[in-house]
Each structure stands twice: as C-alpha cells, then as structure tokens.
Amino acid sequence: MAHRCLLLWSRGGCRRGLPPLLVPRGCLGPDRRPCLRTLYQYATVQTASSRRSLLRDVIAAYQRFCSRPPKGFEKYFPNGKNGKKASEPKEAVGEKKEPQPSGPQPSGGAGGGGGKRRGKKEDSHWWSRFQKGDFPWDDKDFRMYFLWTALFWGGVMIYFVFKSSGREITWKDFVNNYLSKGVVDRLEVVNKRFVRVTFTPGKTPVDGQYVWFNIGSVDTFERNLETLQQELGIEGENRVPVVYIAESDGSFLLSMLPTVLIIAFLLYTIRRGPAGIGRTGRGMGGLFSVGETTAKVLKDEIDVKFKDVAGCEEAKLEIMEFVNFLKNPKQYQDLGAKIPKGAILTGPPGTGKTLLAKATAGEANVPFITVSGSEFLEMFVGVGPARVRDLFALARKNAPCILFIDEIDAVGRKRGRGNFGGQSEQENTLNQLLVEMDGFNTTTNVVILAGTNRPDILDPALLRPGRFDRQIFIGPPDIKGRASIFKVHLRPLKLDSALEKDKLARKLASLTPGFSGADVANVCNEAALIAARHLSDAINEKHFEQAIERVIGGLEKKTQVLQPEEKKTVAYHEAGHAVAGWYLEHADPLLKVSIIPRGKGLGYAQYLPKEQYLYTKEQLLDRMCMTLGGRVSEEIFFGRITTGAQDDLRKVTQSAYAQIVQFGMNEKVGQISFDLPRQGDMVLEKPYSEATARMIDDEVRILISDAYRRTVALLTEKKADVEKVALLLLEKEVLDKNDMVQLLGPRPFTEKSTYEEFVEGTGSLDEDTSLPEGLQDWNKEREKEEKKEKEKEEPLNEKVVS
C-alpha cells in the first residue's frame, strides 16, 4: 500500500508535499529531485510486482477450480477421489509394494453376507448410509447437520414461546377504554381475522403491550365501527383510519411440522421396510429391495458341532462326505466321479434335520448360506424368482460353499394344482429354482442341502438326480441312537454323584421307545426344571422318571376335583386296561398306572412297547383288546358305559382300518392296500368303489366286535383281579409294576425291560460311530497338509545330507 501512495504523490496526486518522515536523510535540501526520482522508481517496481502477484493468485485459483472433478466422476481424474494426491509421497525407485493379503475377508455375520455384499463404511456418504437404514452418528458432517437442524428448530420454538403476543380485549373494552377516550391512532386488520390497535404517540399503555380483538367478518366490523363513530360524534378527518395488512406469524411452520415428520417417517419406512431391518448395507431396503435374498451367510459363528449330533450316524456320514467333496475334490475326480449337486433331508419332525445342517455349518470351514423356503414368497409378483436368482448369485460369489434351504416344501410343492394367483407365483419360483439347480447356468462348487418332513408333496422334478442326487431319510432313533442322544444331552447337566452317565443314558433309552431327538432333549430339560423346582442340589433318577411321564402323559393335575363316583369309574377303567394287558401275550408290558389326571385324560397308564418294526395280526389284535379293556370293565362292574373311552375307541378304529385297508389282513377284502388320508387332508374321492367301501366298513365293525367279545370274556374271567387292582388304585392312586406283581403274580409271558435285553443279538451295546478310511480327515484339505509335511521334511533331509 505504501508504494502505491508514493506513486500517487510523485504523479502530483498529492498537493500537500512529501511527508518528512518518508524523505531519506540528507535529501531535505532545496534540490529534492534525485530523491524523488529514486522514490518514484521504487514505487513503480513495487506496483508492477503486486500486480503480477495478484494476477498469479487469480490464475492459480482458477486452475484449482477447473481441476476439481465433477461430483460422481472423481475416479476418472488423476487427482480425483481414487487418484494419488499431490501431497502423498511418491514411491522410491525400486521399492517393492507389499503384497495385499489374499485370505478370505471376515464375513459380516448372519445379517446377510456382511462385508461381502457392501462397501467400506468410511467411504460412504452419510446421506447414502441414512437412506440404507444406517444411522450415521459417527459421521462428523451428519453430527453438524443434526446439530444445526436441532438449533434451528429449537430457536423457532423459543421464538414462538417467548414472542410477545399482545393482550386480547373485547369489543366492549375497545369502545369504552380506547376509542371513546381518543387514544387510538389507527386500526390494523391482520389477515382478516383480528384487529390490532395502534395508539397515538404518548398514549401507549403502561405495560407496553399492544391490544387486539377478534372479528367475525370484515364487513360486520366496518359496519359496527362506522355506526360507533357516528354515535361518538367522530366526523371527517378525526375518524380512525383502518389499514388491512397480511402477516405471516410463522404458525404455518408448526402446522406443517407434523406433516413433514409423517412424510419423513413413511419414506424411511419404505426405504428400509420390514425386509431391510437388520440388513443394513444391502441396497435401499424395503420396497426397493424385495428382490434381494434374505439368506444369511454363516462362517465360524455356529457353536453346534458333529459331536453334538447323535442317533443318525448314517446321515452324518453322508453330510461329511459332501463337505469332503468341497475340501478334497481331487480324491473323487481322480476316479472320474462327479461332485453331487445336493441332498434332501427328510423325516418326521424333531429327528435332527436342521440340527445336522447347523453342525455342518459349524464344522464345514466353508461359507454356509441358510434360507427358509417361505422367505421366497411375498405379496409382490415376481419376488420369488428374483430372490432365487439373487440367492444363487450370492452362492456363486462365496463358492465353494454349502446352501441350505429349510422347509423346502413351502416352495417346492407339486405343480398343476390350479392356476390361482398364489399358486402361479409359487410355480414360477419353483421353476426358477429348478433352472438354477440344474440348467444352463449351473452352479459350480455349490452343494445344496434341503430339509422337509413332507417329501410326498414335493415336485418330482425337484427330487430327480442332478438336482438332489441323494435323499437322506432321518427317522426316529432306535434304542442305541436314543442312548447316544441322552449322552449328549446329559453332558451339561449336574447329575447326582451316585449316577453314572452311561448307565443312566441306557436306562432312559429303554424307557423312551419311539422318542425323537427333540423329545429326548425335552426330557433332559424337564428333569433339570423339576430338580430346580424342588431346590435339589443335583438331578437324580426320580426327576428323569417324572420328566418322562410329563412328556408322555402331560401335566399332572393333582388339584383337579373329581366326584367320588367319577373317581371310582376311572379306577375301574384303568384297572381294566392293566389286567387285560397283563394277561395278553402280545400286549405291551405295563410300567405304571395312575388315576391322577394328566393332560386331557382322567387316568394314565405307561407301557413299554417292544423295539420292533414288524407286527403280526395277533399282536395288533391283542393291542386292540387291551385298549378296549377300559370300556369293558365299566360295562362289567357298573352295567353302563361312559364317554371316557372315546380316545380308546378312536385308536381301535384306526388300527382296524389300517389292518384291512393298508396291510391286507382281511380275507374278505383281500390282499389289497390303499393309502389312508392324513389327518386334516381334504378327501375329494376315495380310491375304491362304494361297494368296496361298504365291505371295508362291515369288516371293520366285525373285527372290532370280535375284539370286544374277546376282551369281555377275558375280564369276566379275571373279574376278581380287576377289582383288586381298582381298589388299590383308589387307595394309592399310583401303582407301578412291583405293585401289580404283588397283586396278580408274575406275568405269564417273558418280557424285555432292560437296555441289555433290548440290544441283545445286535452286535454291540452302542451304535457304530467309526468313519470310513476316506473320511478320516474329512474336514481337512489334504493337499495343504501334504505341502506342510513336505516343508517340514525338507530341512530334516538337508541336515542329514550335511
């Protein structure tokens, strides 16, 4: 700035002369021309330099502005978002880059793939993350926006709370206190809703607030004001002027706030939606992501191992072999074998299909993708096929992997049962599933497992080899399998010190014929709950017996009130069952009989069925007679029958129809077999004629009548025994096998009751859990193991040579 002032002075722009302080010493004489010339030259040089500096700054700013890449195109510019910045140091010549780790990145967990399906969190803008349902509180910009928004709306609220709103008066107060006293300067009609009174200078009220009053309509106000001023004698220029103004008091902002909040909530809900909850980072969510799969990618997140699965060793071997296919394919490819595409696990509920899949996920050491069959179908058309495509695309990205579809019958039902909307969508989803499993776009290194307990309703195209090469049936465990399952579930329990786990597991296995793995787990859990209920320090054998009774018979109802006559009827009914079974050769051995109500029944009898898979006609007939023993006992001792035998009659009827319709055990109907309808199935037509149906009904009635007459004859002969058992039941309420032996003597037929007797002749006491030689290292990659062994052997060989 100084050199500019000097230049201005030297050109005559300053008439007052050069300030003395700016003149060098020795130049204050009369001849100041050399000094002025020096100063002029200095000022000229400095001005030119400043102009060049200013121009240089402008050009540099323009270049920086032009070099900034457009938003969204940063990666196409060398110094853009992905390019190397000028401030970053260049790599030295000859310096080698460190290799990037090629190992598998950590999975995002069970939320649908995690890191495999999303970008880095720090690279994403906070608004994009907020759209995807992620609340970006860790973002600095988001916190600043949130803070300023909160301050803005807080200021608005404070403004409206503390804003002076004046003092409201009535029309009468306005006339008497203000207009009649001549203190009104003018009236302002605001928004045609109220009138603000402006006072003449010096006449303002003491409180300093303005006053206002409401008006109904402008016309009425003007008419009343005109009449009032005439009455008060206010004429001409002295009349109060009326001004009409329109003001915005900001109340519309508050009125719009609920609407804005509702719209924001709806947009957030639509973008995230039910399908997007817990799946942040997978697209926009909600309606915009219905075509995305809801599958979960699991790896090293399941605690269930194969040691926790028992009672289905054959199925375990099959699943281990599938994992071995993925880990060591060379073992099979060298022999020309192809890796199977998949396997479907079938069997009754509770036998361990899903548990086996969980164990596979826990030990496979490959990505495990799980999805439910019902997750493919939604209310939108086309969602099912889209999710199937996305599911298999996810599987290909994670190959080699295992894909598990639980309850596949939800999407794999047979086609051709009508062309309704839902059925058509289900068929389209099934068609897409068939194409993805074995079509032109065949997946590689992806093993597909599926589970269902209704294989009879699956489409045949789904079950053919090439899609599901193997069908693995997992049935209820036998006595050895139950013993193994009990050992697994007894492991974490605190048992009494006098109990041995192996012996206890075998005894419980012999007491629970027909139990599935889920039933066994329930028994162990119930025993622990019963022990805790009684504040026991450990679980003893009595607790397990009570748990078995709880699972079989239901909850014991000791407080249920029975009339003495009803209790007596129940006692004779249960005594009839017990005595009939005691003297019938093929009936199941009795363990316990009780007249304490359990579940829906008023009495309870526990038997020990034999562990067998084939039944003769004589065995089925003896079981029918034992079941009818309760009704026969009522008729013999009371001369009447009650409704208590309804469940017994239902079981007898089912057994009779099964013998005649399914098993071909009737000479008149012949050696034929028809499928009986399942409970709850709609039967439109029978597979046989009306004449055959009439014949079947007649033979069923004859068979049941013969069994009833046989039971009547037996209990009439053993009437005294029935009465002894009934009287003791009324006295003790619960009888076990020892009580029956004391009353009736030993049972006249041989029977099996211990674990060792049941497994006699089967080769061993426990189930065979040995693995074939090819599956000894089923969970290890042999090539890597061999390389490690060679690397260990090489240094040893070098030492030996040296």
UniProtKB/Swiss-Prot annotation:
Residues where ATP binds: V309, A310, T351, G352, K353, T354, L355, H489
Transit peptide recorded as keyword: yes
Swiss-Prot/TrEMBL cofactor(s): Zn(2+)
UniProt PTM comment: Upon import into the mitochondrion, the N-terminal transit peptide is cleaved to generate an intermediate form which undergoes autocatalytic proteolytic processing to generate the proteolytically active mature form.
Annotated positions of the N6-succinyllysine modification: K116
Enzyme class: hydrolase
Residue numbers covered by the propeptide annotation in the UniProt entry: 39-66
Catalytic activity: ATP + H2O = ADP + phosphate + H(+)
Protein name, per record: Mitochondrial inner membrane m-AAA protease component AFG3L2
Protein's organism: Mus musculus
Gene designation per UniProt: Afg3l2
